[in-house]
From Swiss-Prot:
This is CUGBP Elav-like family member 3. RNA-binding protein involved in the regulation of pre-mRNA alternative splicing. Mediates exon inclusion and/or exclusion in pre-mRNA that are subject to tissue-specific and developmentally regulated alternative splicing. Specifically activates exon 5 inclusion of cardiac isoforms of TNNT2 during heart remodeling at the juvenile to adult transition. Activates the splicing of MAPT/Tau exon 10. Binds to muscle-specific splicing enhancer (MSE) intronic sites flanking the alternative exon 5 of TNNT2 pre-mRNA. It comes from the Eukaryota. Belongs to the CELF/BRUNOL family. Disulfide bonds: none annotated. Residues 345-375 are annotated as: Disordered. One of its GO terms (molecular function) is mRNA binding. Keywords: Activator, Cytoplasm, mRNA processing, mRNA splicing, Nucleus, Repeat, RNA-binding.
Length: 461
């Protein structure tokens, strides 16, 4: 029969050919087993190399953890076996306390004596710096959750110890997941990922607007060629940022209101509205009196805008509905299901002659400048599969001026290889990014951030 305070253990680093009957002899020596289940994929049924283990008695679980966890390596494995309380168990059976506002002169023994009246202590450690000086805090682990809770109820804020600036702090220590979540929140705060409503006022307003414009340009650069609606979203984001920057009421751009003018714009002189409503950083394409675009104009994604028609020519209703939105009408092929009669203007790339050698050399120099000086380029490993250039750019912008940010993609599958690089313009920013982000956990991934090797060294990939 299982005891009420029995612990459910997670067992990792198990050879995939071992089943429950093979594992029982390893664990039975520590006590009677209530349940042992090998974890398998629910779709394929394949062994995942781990298991859940529950003893009838709590002491048996503690003995097994003490004797086996990272102490023994099973045949065929490169790393020692992992035996620890399962996540679901550790949340309900928290026994580890954080103790803050201790005096600098207090030792492990002093802290132990303070907490011994509440139960049996498994661990007691005062945190110290590299020079051995106490940091004024400690971790204390009891054998049971009830003992830890009793210590909190009695000692928290109950006294102020000599040398401390405020009353004693006693609380449950953060779990690994909570620490990871807090670090993500701190980085999100640095990146300006706040509520847009809360940031329409105050000191962060300008920063939010700049981020919106930056994100809009990135969205357009990386996804507009896939969908015209992505371009629409980018224009919308820049529109909102530009209007907010002038203290106006932002009116969303909607495809169904092409013939009307947003009230905020109609009530404002044209000169008061920023021109940064283009895609990929370009302003709307200028037209000549003939209605045709200037021959040397730059077009987003290398595609001609739909040319304006003369008054005598028949006006397509869809084009009329989107009058003035050249970036949206730059994708006539996307409307083939709605308006098959749309002409297909040739791409700008096909019309332009090859650039002269001098321009080609300048382009090569610009490409080389995308990498920073030695000591300013960092590699990031273990990126989440869904991360793109824009995500790592936003992640590392707080540490300094970013020259380039790139996620490596498999050309055959177009899937991320889960690593990339970021180039800063100075070594100090690179070092700050490494110190802050190396080991940072995103979901189940823990980032590895390090300096890029010199060009004459073997590349890590």
């Amino acid at each position: 029969m299982k005891e009420p305070d029995a612990i459910k253990l997670f067992v990792g680093q198990i050879p995939r050919h071992l089943e429950e009957k093979d594992l029982k002899p390893i664990f039975e020596q520590f006590g009677r087993i209530f349940e042992l289940t090998v974890i398998k994929d629910k779709y394929t049924g394949l062994h995942k190399g781990c298991a859940f283990l529950t003893y009838c008695a709590r002491d048996s679980a503690l003995k097994a953890q003490s004797a086996l966890h990272e102490q023994k390596t099973l045949p065929g494995m490169n790393r020692p076996i992992q035996v620890k309380p399962a996540d679901s168990e550790s949340r309900g059976e928290d026994r580890k306390l954080f103790v803050g506002m201790l005096g600098k002169q207090q030792t492990d023994e002093d802290v132990r004596k303070m907490f011994e009246p509440f139960g049996t202590i498994d661990e007691c450690t005062v945190l110290r710096g590299p020079d051995g000086t106490s940091k004024g805090c400690a971790f204390v682990k009891f054998q049971t959750h009830a003992e830890a809770q009793a210590a909190i109820n009695t000692l928290h804020s109950s006294r102020t110890l000599p040398g401390a600036s405020s009353s004693l702090v006693v609380k449950f220590a953060d779990t690994e997941k909570e620490r990871g979540l807090r670090r993500m929140q701190q980085v999100a705060t640095q990146l300006g990922m706040f509520s847009p409503i809360a940031l329409q006022f105050g000191a962060y307003s300008a920063y939010t607007q700049a981020l919106m414009q930056q994100q809009a340009a990135l969205v357009a650069a990386h996804s507009a060629y896939l969908s015209p609606m992505a371009t629409m979203a980018a224009v919308q984001m820049q529109h909102m940022a530009a209007i907010n920057a002038n203290g106006l009421i932002a009116t969303p751009i909607t495809p169904s209101s092409g013939t009307s003018t947003p009230p905020a714009i109609a009530a404002t002189p044209v000169s008061a509205i920023p021109a940064a409503l283009g895609v990929n950083g370009y302003s709307p394409v200028p037209t000549q009196p003939t209605g045709q675009p200037a021959p040397d104009a730059l077009y987003p994604n290398g595609v001609h805008p739909y040319p304006a028609q003369s008054p005598a020519a028949p006006v397509d209703p869809l084009q009329q509905a989107y009058a003035g939105m050249q970036h949206y009408t730059a994708y006539p092929a996307a409307y083939s299901l709605v308006a098959p009669a749309f002409p297909q203007p040739p791409a700008l790339v096909a019309q332009q002659p090859p650039p002269p050698p001098q321009q080609q050399q300048q382009q090569q120099q610009q490409q080389q400048q995308r990498e920073g000086p030695d000591g300013c380029n960092i590699f990031i490993y273990h990126l989440p599969q869904e991360f793109t250039d824009s995500e790592i750019l936003q992640m590392f912008v707080p540490f300094g001026h970013v020259i380039s940010a790139k996620v490596f993609v498999d050309r055959a599958t177009n899937q991320s290889k889960c690593f990339g690089f970021v180039s800063f313009d100075n070594p100090a920013s690179a070092q700050a990014a490494i110190q802050a982000m190396n080991g940072f956990q995103i979901g189940m991934k823990r980032l590895k951030v390090q300096l890029k090797r010199p060009k004459d060294a073997n590349r890590p990939y």
